[in-house]
Amino acid sequence: MKLQPDQVEKPLRKLRMQLNALPPNPRPEEVHSLRMYTRRLEATIAAMALEREKKARCLLKLIKSVRKAAGEVRDMDVLIGNVLTICGHQGCGPAVRLVEHLAKMRVRNARRLHRLVRRERREFSTRLKQSSRLIRKKMKNGVADREGETPPQILITELSHWPSLDEGNLHLFRIRVKELRYMLQLNEQADARLVDALGEVKDTVGEWHDWVELEKIARKVLDPRSDGDLLKRIRLTGGEKLQIALAAAIRLRERYFHLPDARKAGVKILQMAS
């Protein structure tokens, strides 16, 4: 898998701009973009096997903290939208209380994200510049081409040996699929069908997991007797999303990862990505 310079360096540029301009109450699209480029940068560092470099490890530690903080903001945006899909924008008593609770959590999480970015902004700038120079050096020396195949191959082998998919391991399966997809996207010549198939599973399983998290919060906020109808609708929707997610994940696995020899699966996928 040959890495493309533009795809490799883009997350570094985008993150520098976003971290310098992040407002105290970022819009959902700003949060989404921040999370996406932290993920892509993590994938770049992994694909180029840069974790052994101290400067890259320091940057990974920083972006992981930002990604997690941004994820907590993103979760509230999505969960509020999920509640509104059940009761509509007019709402109902229990739904209004739940949305208000989620909105308060969103404000709290956004403030936490902003404080983190503001506190670490100078360190981020330094580490991003260092890593940018390191990546350009590796690309110039051709190291990325030689070492870029190893991390995707590891993920492919893991996915090829994955146990039977169920509710207990589906979320972790999604994480591995997402990591592989980001790595393959570093190559502009990657097969669009493969990238789309990985993206479909990422989104479908992620949607189910959001409903799981919503049910956990709803059970803490709502009364099981007086608010039982809303709790039931959330639970049933989550169950429906689980079946859809499992079906999509199984299709992906059977099409791309269900080969007798995991090495053959790896060769097949890497050929599609080159």
Question: PLM features: residue spans?
Answer:
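Function-determining surface determinants
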Residues: 1-274
